[in-house]
Amino acid sequence: MVWSRTNQLIAAAAEGLGARAEPLGREHTDYFMRLSLGERRAIVSKTRSPFLTQVAQGLANNKHLSRELLRARGLPCAEGVLVDESGDIHGPAVRELLARHGRLVVKPNWGNRGVGVATDVRDLATLARARDRARGLDLDEEVLVEPFIAGTNLRVAVIGGQAVAAAEVVRPKLQVGRSAEAQVAALNGDPRRGTWSAPSLCPMDQIEAEEDLAGHLEVYGLELEAPIPAGREVEITGEELEVIDRTDEVHPEWLAVAASACDLLGVDVGGVDLRGPMAAFAGPPASAAGAALLLEVNVVPALHLHALPTQGRARPVFAAFVAYCLQLPGAPPPCAVVGV
Protein backbone atom coordinates (compact mmCIF):
# COMPACT_ATOMS: atom_id res chain seq x y z
CA MET A 1 0.00 0.00 0.00
CA VAL A 2 1.42 3.37 -1.04
CA TRP A 3 -0.20 6.57 0.16
CA SER A 4 -0.15 9.71 -1.92
CA ARG A 5 2.12 12.55 -0.81
CA THR A 6 -0.77 14.25 1.00
CA ASN A 7 -1.74 11.11 2.90
CA GLN A 8 1.88 10.36 3.76
CA LEU A 9 2.08 13.83 5.32
CA ILE A 10 -1.19 13.30 7.18
CA ALA A 11 0.02 9.95 8.51
CA ALA A 12 3.36 11.41 9.63
CA ALA A 13 1.59 14.31 11.37
CA ALA A 14 -0.77 11.89 13.10
CA GLU A 15 2.15 9.83 14.35
CA GLY A 16 3.82 12.96 15.65
CA LEU A 17 0.69 13.72 17.68
CA GLY A 18 0.49 10.17 19.03
CA ALA A 19 -2.47 9.35 16.78
CA ARG A 20 -3.00 6.62 14.18
CA ALA A 21 -3.74 6.92 10.49
CA GLU A 22 -5.00 3.80 8.76
CA PRO A 23 -6.91 2.68 5.67
CA LEU A 24 -10.67 2.79 5.90
CA GLY A 25 -11.43 -0.54 4.23
CA ARG A 26 -9.82 -3.77 3.10
CA GLU A 27 -9.18 -2.53 -0.42
CA HIS A 28 -6.72 0.35 -0.58
CA THR A 29 -8.12 3.71 -1.58
CA ASP A 30 -6.22 6.94 -1.30
CA TYR A 31 -9.41 8.98 -0.97
CA PHE A 32 -10.28 8.01 2.60
CA MET A 33 -8.32 7.53 5.80
CA ARG A 34 -9.30 6.96 9.43
CA LEU A 35 -7.60 8.99 12.13
CA SER A 36 -7.79 7.88 15.76
CA LEU A 37 -6.42 8.79 19.16
CA GLY A 38 -7.91 7.08 22.19
CA GLU A 39 -11.68 7.39 21.88
CA ARG A 40 -11.45 10.06 19.20
CA ARG A 41 -12.16 9.04 15.59
CA ALA A 42 -12.35 10.95 12.31
CA ILE A 43 -12.65 9.93 8.67
CA VAL A 44 -10.95 12.31 6.26
CA SER A 45 -10.78 12.49 2.47
CA LYS A 46 -7.33 13.86 1.67
CA THR A 47 -7.52 17.30 3.30
CA ARG A 48 -11.31 17.40 3.47
CA SER A 49 -12.33 17.27 7.11
CA PRO A 50 -15.29 15.27 8.49
CA PHE A 51 -17.05 18.60 9.13
CA LEU A 52 -17.16 19.88 5.52
CA THR A 53 -20.66 19.92 4.04
CA GLN A 54 -21.48 19.15 0.43
CA VAL A 55 -23.21 22.53 0.14
CA ALA A 56 -20.08 24.38 1.26
CA GLN A 57 -17.87 22.39 -1.11
CA GLY A 58 -20.17 23.02 -4.07
CA LEU A 59 -20.48 26.71 -3.27
CA ALA A 60 -16.72 27.22 -3.04
CA ASN A 61 -16.20 25.28 -6.27
CA ASN A 62 -18.49 27.70 -8.11
CA LYS A 63 -15.96 30.49 -8.56
CA HIS A 64 -18.33 33.12 -9.96
CA LEU A 65 -21.11 32.68 -7.42
CA SER A 66 -18.81 32.41 -4.41
CA ARG A 67 -16.97 35.55 -5.49
CA GLU A 68 -20.24 37.43 -5.91
CA LEU A 69 -21.27 36.47 -2.38
CA LEU A 70 -17.91 37.36 -0.88
CA ARG A 71 -17.81 40.70 -2.68
CA ALA A 72 -21.25 41.51 -1.30
CA ARG A 73 -19.80 41.00 2.19
CA GLY A 74 -17.06 43.52 1.53
CA LEU A 75 -14.11 41.27 0.63
CA PRO A 76 -11.76 42.51 -2.14
CA CYS A 77 -12.58 40.00 -4.88
CA ALA A 78 -11.61 40.06 -8.55
CA GLU A 79 -14.37 40.91 -11.01
CA GLY A 80 -15.41 38.51 -13.74
CA VAL A 81 -17.92 37.66 -16.44
CA LEU A 82 -19.65 34.28 -16.45
CA VAL A 83 -20.31 32.77 -19.88
CA ASP A 84 -22.61 29.74 -19.74
CA GLU A 85 -23.23 27.16 -22.49
CA SER A 86 -25.54 29.52 -24.37
CA GLY A 87 -23.51 32.70 -23.78
CA ASP A 88 -21.40 34.63 -26.28
CA ILE A 89 -17.70 34.85 -25.45
CA HIS A 90 -17.58 37.87 -27.75
CA GLY A 91 -20.51 39.58 -26.03
CA PRO A 92 -20.36 43.20 -24.89
CA ALA A 93 -19.45 42.40 -21.27
CA VAL A 94 -16.38 40.37 -22.27
CA ARG A 95 -15.36 42.85 -24.98
CA GLU A 96 -15.59 45.67 -22.48
CA LEU A 97 -13.44 43.70 -20.03
CA LEU A 98 -10.81 43.09 -22.72
CA ALA A 99 -10.84 46.73 -23.85
CA ARG A 100 -10.46 47.97 -20.27
CA HIS A 101 -7.73 45.58 -19.12
CA GLY A 102 -6.00 44.39 -22.31
CA ARG A 103 -5.14 41.00 -20.81
CA LEU A 104 -7.63 38.41 -19.57
CA VAL A 105 -7.71 35.05 -17.82
CA VAL A 106 -10.17 32.35 -18.94
CA LYS A 107 -10.97 29.38 -16.71
CA PRO A 108 -13.61 26.71 -16.05
CA ASN A 109 -16.03 28.06 -13.47
CA TRP A 110 -15.79 24.72 -11.62
CA GLY A 111 -12.09 24.13 -12.35
CA ASN A 112 -9.46 22.43 -10.20
CA ARG A 113 -5.65 22.47 -9.98
CA GLY A 114 -5.34 25.09 -12.73
CA VAL A 115 -6.54 22.69 -15.44
CA GLY A 116 -8.08 24.57 -18.36
CA VAL A 117 -6.90 27.99 -17.16
CA ALA A 118 -5.47 30.29 -19.84
CA THR A 119 -3.64 33.43 -18.76
CA ASP A 120 -2.40 36.38 -20.83
CA VAL A 121 -5.30 36.21 -23.29
CA ARG A 122 -5.04 39.34 -25.45
CA ASP A 123 -7.21 38.83 -28.54
CA LEU A 124 -10.62 37.48 -29.51
CA ALA A 125 -9.28 34.44 -31.40
CA THR A 126 -7.30 33.23 -28.37
CA LEU A 127 -10.29 34.08 -26.19
CA ALA A 128 -12.54 31.80 -28.27
CA ARG A 129 -10.09 28.89 -28.14
CA ALA A 130 -9.64 29.36 -24.39
CA ARG A 131 -13.43 29.38 -23.97
CA ASP A 132 -13.84 26.14 -25.89
CA ARG A 133 -11.20 24.35 -23.84
CA ALA A 134 -12.43 25.64 -20.49
CA ARG A 135 -16.05 24.83 -21.36
CA GLY A 136 -15.15 21.26 -22.23
CA LEU A 137 -13.54 20.79 -18.81
CA ASP A 138 -16.26 22.46 -16.74
CA LEU A 139 -18.94 20.60 -14.81
CA ASP A 140 -21.73 22.76 -16.27
CA GLU A 141 -19.96 24.06 -19.41
CA GLU A 142 -19.55 27.44 -17.71
CA VAL A 143 -16.55 29.69 -18.32
CA LEU A 144 -15.29 32.54 -16.15
CA VAL A 145 -13.49 35.44 -17.82
CA GLU A 146 -11.60 37.85 -15.58
CA PRO A 147 -8.88 40.50 -15.80
CA PHE A 148 -5.26 39.38 -15.70
CA ILE A 149 -3.80 40.65 -12.42
CA ALA A 150 -0.07 41.25 -12.49
CA GLY A 151 2.02 40.12 -9.55
CA THR A 152 2.36 37.20 -7.18
CA ASN A 153 0.23 34.10 -6.70
CA LEU A 154 -0.29 33.93 -2.94
CA ARG A 155 -1.90 30.86 -1.35
CA VAL A 156 -3.15 31.13 2.24
CA ALA A 157 -3.99 27.95 4.17
CA VAL A 158 -6.96 28.15 6.54
CA ILE A 159 -7.64 25.36 9.04
CA GLY A 160 -10.57 25.45 11.43
CA GLY A 161 -11.23 29.10 10.62
CA GLN A 162 -7.64 30.19 11.28
CA ALA A 163 -5.12 31.30 8.63
CA VAL A 164 -2.05 29.22 9.48
CA ALA A 165 0.36 29.67 6.55
CA ALA A 166 0.96 31.65 3.37
CA ALA A 167 3.15 30.85 0.38
CA GLU A 168 4.09 32.48 -2.91
CA VAL A 169 3.57 30.01 -5.76
CA VAL A 170 5.76 30.72 -8.79
CA ARG A 171 4.45 29.14 -11.99
CA PRO A 172 6.77 27.98 -14.81
CA LYS A 173 6.78 30.23 -17.87
CA LEU A 174 7.90 28.96 -21.26
CA GLN A 175 10.79 30.91 -22.73
CA VAL A 176 10.99 32.21 -26.30
CA GLY A 177 13.02 30.26 -28.86
CA ARG A 178 12.81 26.74 -27.41
CA SER A 179 10.06 24.17 -27.73
CA ALA A 180 7.69 23.53 -24.85
CA GLU A 181 8.64 19.85 -25.03
CA ALA A 182 12.34 20.59 -24.46
CA GLN A 183 11.64 23.06 -21.68
CA VAL A 184 9.35 20.66 -19.84
CA ALA A 185 12.00 17.92 -20.11
CA ALA A 186 14.49 20.30 -18.49
CA LEU A 187 12.01 21.19 -15.74
CA ASN A 188 11.35 17.50 -15.08
CA GLY A 189 15.07 16.97 -14.52
CA ASP A 190 14.73 18.87 -11.24
CA PRO A 191 15.25 16.29 -8.45
CA ARG A 192 12.61 18.13 -6.41
CA ARG A 193 9.92 16.73 -8.74
CA GLY A 194 8.29 13.41 -7.92
CA THR A 195 5.99 11.15 -9.91
CA TRP A 196 2.34 10.22 -9.45
CA SER A 197 3.15 6.53 -9.98
CA ALA A 198 5.63 6.43 -7.09
CA PRO A 199 4.49 9.08 -4.60
CA SER A 200 7.23 10.58 -2.45
CA LEU A 201 7.73 13.69 -0.36
CA CYS A 202 9.16 15.70 -3.25
CA PRO A 203 7.71 19.22 -3.07
CA MET A 204 6.71 19.36 -6.75
CA ASP A 205 5.35 17.00 -9.39
CA GLN A 206 6.60 15.92 -12.79
CA ILE A 207 4.87 17.84 -15.59
CA GLU A 208 2.94 15.50 -17.89
CA ALA A 209 3.27 17.29 -21.22
CA GLU A 210 0.94 15.03 -23.19
CA GLU A 211 -1.72 15.01 -20.47
CA ASP A 212 -2.64 18.70 -20.30
CA LEU A 213 0.06 20.95 -21.71
CA ALA A 214 -0.61 20.07 -25.35
CA GLY A 215 -4.22 21.25 -25.05
CA HIS A 216 -3.08 24.32 -23.14
CA LEU A 217 -0.68 25.27 -25.94
CA GLU A 218 -3.40 24.86 -28.58
CA VAL A 219 -5.24 27.76 -26.97
CA TYR A 220 -2.32 30.00 -27.98
CA GLY A 221 -1.97 28.42 -31.44
CA LEU A 222 1.22 26.60 -30.41
CA GLU A 223 2.50 23.01 -30.49
CA LEU A 224 4.65 21.00 -28.09
CA GLU A 225 7.47 20.50 -30.60
CA ALA A 226 7.57 24.06 -32.01
CA PRO A 227 9.70 26.89 -30.57
CA ILE A 228 7.81 29.48 -28.54
CA PRO A 229 7.61 32.64 -30.70
CA ALA A 230 8.61 36.12 -29.56
CA GLY A 231 5.89 38.17 -27.91
CA ARG A 232 4.07 35.20 -26.44
CA GLU A 233 4.06 34.48 -22.70
CA VAL A 234 2.79 31.03 -21.75
CA GLU A 235 2.42 30.20 -18.08
CA ILE A 236 2.04 26.53 -17.17
CA THR A 237 -0.91 26.85 -14.84
CA GLY A 238 -1.36 24.25 -12.14
CA GLU A 239 2.39 23.56 -11.85
CA GLU A 240 5.08 25.06 -9.63
CA LEU A 241 8.56 26.37 -10.33
CA GLU A 242 9.17 27.49 -6.75
CA VAL A 243 7.06 27.64 -3.58
CA ILE A 244 8.28 30.31 -1.16
CA ASP A 245 7.02 30.54 2.39
CA ARG A 246 5.67 34.07 3.04
CA THR A 247 3.76 33.47 6.27
CA ASP A 248 5.66 36.05 8.30
CA GLU A 249 5.57 38.66 5.50
CA VAL A 250 1.82 38.84 4.90
CA HIS A 251 -0.10 41.53 6.76
CA PRO A 252 -2.52 40.11 9.36
CA GLU A 253 -5.46 41.80 7.65
CA TRP A 254 -4.84 39.79 4.46
CA LEU A 255 -4.77 36.62 6.56
CA ALA A 256 -8.06 37.76 8.07
CA VAL A 257 -9.51 38.22 4.56
CA ALA A 258 -8.60 34.61 3.74
CA ALA A 259 -10.09 33.30 6.98
CA SER A 260 -13.27 35.34 6.45
CA ALA A 261 -13.68 34.05 2.90
CA CYS A 262 -13.56 30.46 4.13
CA ASP A 263 -15.86 31.18 7.04
CA LEU A 264 -18.50 32.89 4.89
CA LEU A 265 -18.55 29.96 2.45
CA GLY A 266 -18.60 27.34 5.20
CA VAL A 267 -15.17 25.96 4.23
CA ASP A 268 -13.33 24.87 7.36
CA VAL A 269 -10.12 23.72 5.65
CA GLY A 270 -9.31 25.75 2.56
CA GLY A 271 -6.66 27.29 0.38
CA VAL A 272 -7.39 30.90 -0.54
CA ASP A 273 -5.81 32.27 -3.72
CA LEU A 274 -4.85 35.94 -3.74
CA ARG A 275 -2.97 37.75 -6.49
CA GLY A 276 -1.16 41.05 -6.71
CA PRO A 277 2.27 42.60 -6.11
CA MET A 278 4.01 41.01 -3.13
CA ALA A 279 4.49 44.48 -1.68
CA ALA A 280 0.71 44.88 -1.54
CA PHE A 281 0.41 41.94 0.83
CA ALA A 282 2.86 43.50 3.27
CA GLY A 283 0.29 46.18 4.10
CA PRO A 284 -3.44 46.08 4.82
CA PRO A 285 -5.94 45.43 1.98
CA ALA A 286 -7.10 49.06 2.04
CA SER A 287 -3.63 50.21 1.00
CA ALA A 288 -3.56 47.89 -2.03
CA ALA A 289 -6.27 49.95 -3.77
CA GLY A 290 -7.37 47.10 -6.04
CA ALA A 291 -3.84 46.03 -6.99
CA ALA A 292 -4.24 42.80 -4.99
CA LEU A 293 -7.44 40.78 -4.95
CA LEU A 294 -8.98 37.51 -3.81
CA LEU A 295 -9.48 35.01 -6.63
CA GLU A 296 -11.01 31.90 -5.08
CA VAL A 297 -11.34 29.49 -2.17
CA ASN A 298 -10.15 25.93 -2.78
CA VAL A 299 -11.68 23.08 -0.80
CA VAL A 300 -8.75 20.69 -1.34
CA PRO A 301 -6.04 23.19 -0.49
CA ALA A 302 -2.72 21.52 -1.41
CA LEU A 303 -1.39 21.82 2.13
CA HIS A 304 1.88 20.26 0.95
CA LEU A 305 2.80 23.66 -0.50
CA HIS A 306 3.26 24.90 3.07
CA ALA A 307 4.73 21.71 4.51
CA LEU A 308 7.28 21.26 1.70
CA PRO A 309 8.16 24.73 0.37
CA THR A 310 11.15 24.92 -1.96
CA GLN A 311 12.29 28.06 -0.14
CA GLY A 312 11.69 29.22 3.41
CA ARG A 313 10.34 27.64 6.55
CA ALA A 314 8.13 24.55 6.50
CA ARG A 315 4.87 25.08 8.37
CA PRO A 316 3.16 22.39 10.52
CA VAL A 317 -0.10 22.54 8.58
CA PHE A 318 -0.71 18.79 8.63
CA ALA A 319 -0.37 18.64 12.40
CA ALA A 320 -2.91 21.46 12.60
CA PHE A 321 -5.20 19.54 10.21
CA VAL A 322 -5.03 16.29 12.20
CA ALA A 323 -5.54 18.09 15.51
CA TYR A 324 -8.56 19.90 14.08
CA CYS A 325 -10.15 16.77 12.60
CA LEU A 326 -9.72 14.84 15.86
CA GLN A 327 -10.73 17.90 17.89
CA LEU A 328 -7.69 17.57 20.11
CA PRO A 329 -7.38 19.99 23.05
CA GLY A 330 -6.56 23.48 21.79
CA ALA A 331 -7.86 22.83 18.27
CA PRO A 332 -10.53 25.20 16.89
CA PRO A 333 -14.09 23.86 17.00
CA PRO A 334 -15.85 22.74 13.79
CA CYS A 335 -16.93 25.70 11.67
CA ALA A 336 -18.72 24.46 8.57
CA VAL A 337 -21.89 26.54 8.54
CA VAL A 338 -22.50 28.59 5.39
CA GLY A 339 -22.89 32.17 6.53
CA VAL A 340 -23.31 34.27 3.39
Describe every region a protein language model picked out:
Residues 23, 155, 273:
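Short, surface-exposed charged micro-motifs
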Residues 235-249, 263-269, 276-340:
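C-terminal active-site "lid" helix and adjoining low-complexity regulatory extension at the edge
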Residues 42-47, 53-201, 252-255:
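Active-site nucleotide/adenylate-binding loops and adjacent lid/helix of ATP-dependent enzymes
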Residues 21-44, 225-232:
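Short, composition-biased local secondary-structure segments
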Residues 1-33, 200-217:
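N-terminal-biased segments
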Residues 32-42, 154-159, 163-165, 280-305:
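A short beta-strand motif that forms the metal-chelation/ATP-contact edge
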